[in-house]
A protein has these predicted regions:
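Histidine-rich, glycine-flanked metal-binding segment
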Residues: 1-29
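Histidine-centered catalytic micro-motifs
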Residues: 31-42, 182-191
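Hydrophobic/aromatic beta-strand patches that form the interior of the parallel beta-sheet core
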Residues: 19-21, 33, 114
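Alpha-helical scaffold segments that flank or form the walls of functional sites
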Residues: 45-111, 134-147
């Protein structure tokens, strides 16, 4: 009933008229959870394959992602949702933008999800609240709170150390703490990223830096 299995047995309960499934020679397992994804990138699979991470991001992914329309994001998310369902996943944790359109795909597919907009520092912008990432995150937070819906949850996204700075990181941590939200971030994907962070921040690794600015004072998912 709703999103709950209410009965497992060998006989149909008297008077029950809802859905039933034949479980002979099968096993019932909890759904898998994809802990880190960028579901609209399903459309870009294989694009720029073989490039080092930072060239792949700056030469291929970031420029292409910037051109994705709302419809692109929705249908790519629907394709990704089909792949999740086929593989036994019931929920996923995502970092992207145009959150409303990913949310629509989540609802239309019947999945669950945690959604976040991974903020990156931009010239001319100061605090986190000046960013589109904040506006989308806060709008989704308010909408979900009003709906009382637990199928979709919102997290606060920080793209990575190398696309951020200390002030923005602290702002993200403060907002997550004030709003009672989780943080979703990329931790340390490559040796290059790791070593350059130490050079920029007086020997601190990405993990140590994130801890210092308070990002690990709230529940956090640190992806690769």
């Amino acid at each position: 009933e709703g999103n709950r299995i209410v009965y497992i047995g060998t006989e149909r309960p008297e008077g029950y008229t809802g859905e039933t499934y034949d479980g002979r020679n099968k096993v019932a397992l909890p759904g898998f959870y994809n802990i880190h994804w960028h579901i609209p990138d399903t459309l870009l699979r294989g694009y720029g394959e073989g490039l080092p991470l930072h060239r792949w991001l700056t030469e291929k992914m970031f420029p292409f992602e910037a051109k994705l329309t709302e419809e692109d994001v929705y249908w790519s998310s629907m394709l990704g949702a089909c792949e999740l369902i086929r593989s036994g996943a019931a929920s996923f944790n995502d970092m992207f933008y145009k959150l409303e359109w990913i949310e629509r795909a989540v609802r239309d597919s019947g999945l669950k999800a945690n959604l976040s907009f991974g903020v990156s520092a931009l010239p001319g912008l100061g605090s986190y609240r000046e960013y589109a990432a904040y506006a989308e995150t806060e709008a989704l937070r308010r909408r979900l709170a009003e709906a009382g819906d637990d199928r979709v949850r919102v997290d606060v996204g920080l793209h990575a150390e190398y696309t951020s700075h200390g002030g923005l990181m602290r702002d993200v941590a403060d907002y997550a703490r004030e709003a009672g939200l989780r943080v979703h971030l990329h931790l340390s994907e490559t040796r290059k990223e790791h070593e350059e962070c130490k050079t920029r921040h007086n020997g601190l690794t990405p993990a140590a830096l994130f801890e210092r600015v308070g990002l690990f004072d709230v529940p956090a998912i640190a992806a690769h």
